């Protein structure tokens, strides 16, 4: 089955050898996004809530390039430097997804330079 890779003029450019989004078999896989702007400047010095919104906005931009949104998410992976930020993240996250909520994993991670990274899998057939 063929794969299709997407690039976005709104999401940060990839910082390595990966695509912003890849579609295969009706699923769109979004690469992990962080609080970076289009010029790849990290904003890890901002409050967590600002970093979370910037990260989810970047993920939404990656979804949009495939003609979808985070409301099409069926799985989300969340990586937090500080697990105490989980409640604040969840409040913001609910603005971007819809019920039934996607399956989600939230793990503590030794992120460097920022407090959050989020990836997702979207279902086109929704």
Where do the model's predicted regions map?
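N-terminal presequence-like segments and the immediate start of the first folded domain
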Residues: 1-57, 61-74, 80-126
